Amino acid sequence: MPKSKVRKKNDFTITSVSRTPVKVKVGPSSVWFVTLFVGLMLIGLVWLMVFQLAALGTQAPTALHWMAQLGPWNYAIAFAFMITGLLLTMRWH
């Protein structure tokens, strides 16, 4: 019975691709980024306070008459500022 031939081995071996995630080291966030998200949250808070305390009611000052005309949209604007600031905190290092 004939013998089978021995095959040559390749000079290189194929390495399997690693599936483990590699954590990228990122430095701390810059000062302007922290200022931005804290500022956005404070703007939303101040917007809500001004609307509740000054622009609501029949005795609204003429400077805030435009805010009183927005009505319930003031809540959406204030919370949009605050939520945007909150979402930016997730990118903070």
UniProtKB/Swiss-Prot annotation:
Question: How the protein sits in the membrane?
Answer: Multi-pass membrane protein
Provide the Gene Ontology terms for cellular component.
Answer: plasma membrane
Q: Cross-referenced InterPro entries, in alphabetical order?
A: CrgA
The protein's UniProt keywords, in alphabetical order, are: Cell cycle, Cell division, Cell membrane, Membrane, Transmembrane, Transmembrane helix
- Chief localization: membrane
**Which parts of the chain span the membrane according to its record?**
31-51, 70-90
Pfam families per record: CrgA (PF06781)
Alphabetically, which GO biological process terms does the record hold?
cell division
Q: Where in the cell is it found?
A: Cell membrane
The family assignment reads: Belongs to the CrgA family.
Q: Which NCBIfam families match?
A: PRK00159.1
Report the protein's function: Involved in cell division.
Q: What is this protein called?
A: Cell division protein CrgA
Which species does the entry assign this protein to? Mycobacterium leprae (strain TN)
- Gene that this polypeptide is encoded by: crgA
